[in-house]
Amino acid sequence: MKAVHFGAGNIGRGFVGLLLHEAGYEVVFADVADALISQLASASSYDVHEVGENPAVKTVSGFRAFNSASQEAAVVEEISTADVLTTAVGPHILKFVAPVIARGLAVRPADLPPLQVMACENAINATDLLHTEIRAAWDDSAGDLDAVAVFANTAVDRIVPNQAPGQGLDVTVETFYEWVIDRTPFGGNAPKIPGATFVDELGPYIERKLFTVNTGHASAAYFGYAAGLEKISDAMADPAVAAKVRAVLEETKELLVAKHGFEEAEQEAYVQKILSRFTNPHLPDTVNRVGRAPLRKLSRHERFVGPAAELAERGVTPAALLEAMSAALRFDDGNDDEAVELTNLLSELDAAAAVERITELTPTHPLFPALQKLVEDRQAEA
């Protein structure tokens, strides 16, 4: 069995690539980072260090690696005969890898079963987006795209912090992980990945992860940044910050239980597990790394506005989520492009226009007045 994986970074090596290797796949990494690909191509193995409860070191070997820009022909050939294709490149990069994937699918031998494609990105329905981008790049003379590939959405969860200098290809990750895959597109032929969980309805799991893990992690980052703390574990060790994060997750728990029918005790246990992960002192994750890209994190269907808007539509005032968004508006890390852009927007636009631009909500939405007040308060500080 062979799996082509786009994105040879820390998540690709320390999460998706590891699970594919453990499932028995020969992993072929594709990336445009030339130095990284050169390292992988010349290495026989790398280690994944799992830290936290039950720490372990796992070795990944038997992989190959290609530069998908300068060695495109080789990547196309690998895709044409692969069993599985995965990505961990970031949702905004999918449009750049789609043409290469389309070319690989176009020359896939007719006697092979459809390639099983799964985008493992920190975004809702990322595989649907990849499918759309591949279709846009598809040459209709090659036949029916859906005859040569099957696309399944996934939800992925593993904290992979910035790595210490000098680690080389080795990756440090938390022990916890979750890879949930929609089994329905595969019919009865789902890929054999023992480390993954296959479900018939993925939507509730995607939202549970996004509105608990991502919302909580970003909340800890922004509250921690406001408190002058450096690491996420430092932030969660601060009683005031921890209480604010807990309050945020109480609100998202209320929404998830009401909307998706999760048992309250089950969701509470999930929240407790997530909070314990954030306190892991072995993960040197910084508030600056987790808080980066605040504009994306404050967008309409993301981790803050998404649940807050739904709660407001249900007649609930999401006070804790609003406090987290207020902290996000104050994330002014000069090394982060989106933080700089956010600061500029807040100085250039009036409050109502800024809310519309940042959150994509209309002034008639029930959450809009509260967000406008947050922005007005932030602008008054400037």
From Swiss-Prot:
UniProt-listed GO biological process terms: mannitol catabolic process
Catalytic activity: D-mannitol 1-phosphate + NAD(+) = beta-D-fructose 6-phosphate + NADH + H(+)
One Gene Ontology cellular component: cytosol
Disulphide-bridged cysteine pairs: none
InterPro entries assigned to the protein according to its UniProt record, in alphabetical order: 6-PGluconate_DH-like_C_sf (IPR008927), 6PGD_dom2 (IPR013328), Mannitol_1_phos_5_DH (IPR023028), Mannitol_DH (IPR000669), Mannitol_DH_C (IPR013118), Mannitol_DH_N (IPR013131), NAD(P)-bd_dom_sf (IPR036291)
Domain of life from the UniProt record: Bacteria
EC number per UniProt: 1.1.1.17
Keyword terms of this UniProt record: NAD, Oxidoreductase
UniProt GO MF annotations: mannitol-1-phosphate 5-dehydrogenase activity
Any matching Pfam family: Mannitol_dh
Positions bound to NAD(+): A3, V4, H5, F6, G7, A8, G9, N10, I11, G12, R13, G14
Family, similarity comment: Belongs to the mannitol dehydrogenase family.
Protein name as annotated: Mannitol-1-phosphate 5-dehydrogenase
Protein encoded by which gene: mtlD
